[in-house]
Amino acid sequence: MGLDWTAPNAIEHICQPSAPTGGKCTGPDFVNNVDLKPADVLTDIGNCKLAAVSWVIPSGTNSDHAAKLVNIGGPAWVASIVNAVGNNPVCPNGEVYWNNTAILVTWDDWGGWYDHEPPTVLPQPQGDYQYGFRVPFVFVSAYTPAAYVDNQRHDFGSVLRFIEHNFGITEGALAFADARAATDLTSFYNPNLLPRPFLTISAPKGAQYFINDTTPLTDPDDD
């Protein structure tokens, strides 16, 4: 059996590789907007330089893939980012990150070999895309009611739809996935509520651990 891994093809237009096989990414969007040190997001938060939209992927060591019998890196990594946002002081421009930041946590795998809930079969045309097993998703914000559970069918395209909704972009305008997404995640929060006070998450490792960690970076599996 061979391995057909086409994920890099999806960002080829952003990477603009310097060689047909291998090479470095030379595209301006990649060079200017892709930071290959995951912990830099923590210093960006602390320095009040967090980008309006940030896609944060941990190193392989701090991902939730089952490489070890006990893996505390992944949960601690997520907690460090949420805590950094929630505990960040008022920025010089008056911005309070906890009051205007939504943190969307999801995984690329479902964590097992079975799901008792069969995936919905989408009507054509869908190209080669259909739903698979469910994956976890957590929506963190000051305007999400505590312990809220949403039972609608969401998908990865819903994340794009949320960004479009939040920044006034025509919903469904970015790609195939968001155009066919069932939701835009707005059911997870109510902007008319007063922001809930942040409660620090207890974790065995904090932001300074990840910022100061000199362990060689490894790629997260499949990313």
Positions of the model-derived regions?
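N-terminal pro-sequences and low-complexity stem/linker regions of secreted or lumenal proteins
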Residues: M1-D223
